[in-house]
Amino acid sequence: MNDKKKAVLVVSFGTSYEETRKKTIDQIENDMAEAFPSYAIYRAWTSDMIRAKLLKRDGIRIYNVCEALEAMAADGIQEVIVQPTHVINGIENDQMKADVAAYADRFMRVSIGTPVLTTAEDSKYVIDAIVKELHPAKDEALVLMGHGTEHYADAVYAALDYQFKDLEHSNIFMGTVEGYPTLESVMRLVQKAGYRHVVLAPFMIVAGDHANNDLAGDEEDSWKSVFEAAGFSVRCVLKGLGEYADIRKLLLSHAEKAMEQV
């Protein structure tokens, strides 16, 4: 119970990797608390699988969106700002909005912020943040691993790849684990461009299971192994987007815009 009547609900997919959670989701929430001292900060994760894993393994219970909103209503919160840490406006974000809509009448005011990549301006900002953070050498191909989805928002990844090239970052490539561009597609482009050195980095808020296994794992089908088998020298940077101060600032700005709409 708290005496604040306004709150920010920070909604993330979640992660079972404690180390990356502290550097990403926790840090985003801490930044929100610091930026908006008159708001209570609540947490919700959308992955039922990860929440169940944490409960079983660590005894830690994390609310889903509906449970968090229920708790906020019980705590007397009247104004709710929902800020997702999702990268795209995909399946998880659609479900989050549906859950919030179902609880909207429990509060006086509700406003929902947007995911990381929502506008063309967001994309430009994120590209600048990537370049600033990872600054690949001219003879290196920086290959980013996005999650990917069967949702139509998957088109954002290919659009971002195009925008990297349009902004003169011809050595930065975007791929996905579960959507398009595929690893095979990215590898063809990297080979065609003549690069021999590859830097792999996750394009996800946390550097969790996908980053540690699908990207940098020792299994023969990991991105690292596939590039190495094709003759590339590979360096992995296991840093989630949530570790980038500029990405956290972008999420803060999205929350601020949501507050202005209340």
Question: Which residues are covered by each model-predicted region?
Answer:
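Active-site-proximal alpha-helix that buttresses catalytic centers in soluble enzyme cores
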Residues: 1-262
